[in-house]
Design a protein with these regions (language model features):
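Surface-exposed, charged secondary-structure patches
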Residues: 54-117
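Extracytoplasmic/periplasmic, Sec-exported soluble proteins
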Residues: 20-21, 41-42, 113, 117, ...
Length: 167
């Protein structure tokens, strides 16, 4: 009986430490934007923090695309849809309420940008290793998505890169 009670308490403590999708996204963007503006010249895709917040498949695809010479699949930062970001914009971060979506969650994110404006993104999350992780980000403000999940585009980019190395 004591063993059952101990196991129950242990399971309850694990459950209470699991983050909500909203907390995951908020924590991710606080970390990521701070790192983005620091520009420490390290590849953030390799960091343990990224593995904590971003789905494995997404990180793998971003690394694959990043290694393709002159690729045109990702033309801005995938998680911000920006080329640059200013530290003074970070406090304007706002995260919406998660909604169910195809077995995962989706929520809106507003990033502060120049002139006090906001850029609206939509983050898609799924459970991985018992945690909510970001696997897809869409720029809602501009109706645009960097198609990192398009295998044909990745193959075409690789083929194009191969022709560049022949010259």
């Amino acid at each position: 009986m004591r063993a059952l009670l101990l196991v129950s308490l242990l399971l309850m403590s694990c459950i209470t430490h699991a983050q909500t999708p909203e907390a995951t996204v908020r924590d991710f963007y606080h970390f990521y934007l701070t790192d983005f503006v620091a520009d420490n010249h390290e590849n953030p895709l390799n960091s343990a923090k990224m593995q904590q917040y971003v789905a494995k498949e997404t990180l793998t695809r971003l690394k694959t695309i990043q290694d393709i010479e002159e690729q045109e699949i990702v033309d801005a930062d995938y998680f911000t849809y920006c080329q640059d970001y200013a530290a003074e914009w970070i406090p304007a971060l706002d995260v919406g309420t998660a909604r169910d979506d195809a077995g995962g969650k989706v929520l809106d994110v507003w990033l502060g940008i120049q002139d006090g404006k906001k850029l609206k993104l939509r983050d898609y999350l799924r459970q991985e290793d018992g945690n909510w992780k970001i696997y897809r980000v869409v720029d809602v403000s501009n109706g645009f998505e960097q198609n990192i999940f398009d295998d044909n585009a990745i193959s075409a980019a690789r083929a194009h890169a191969a022709t560049l190395s022949q010259h």
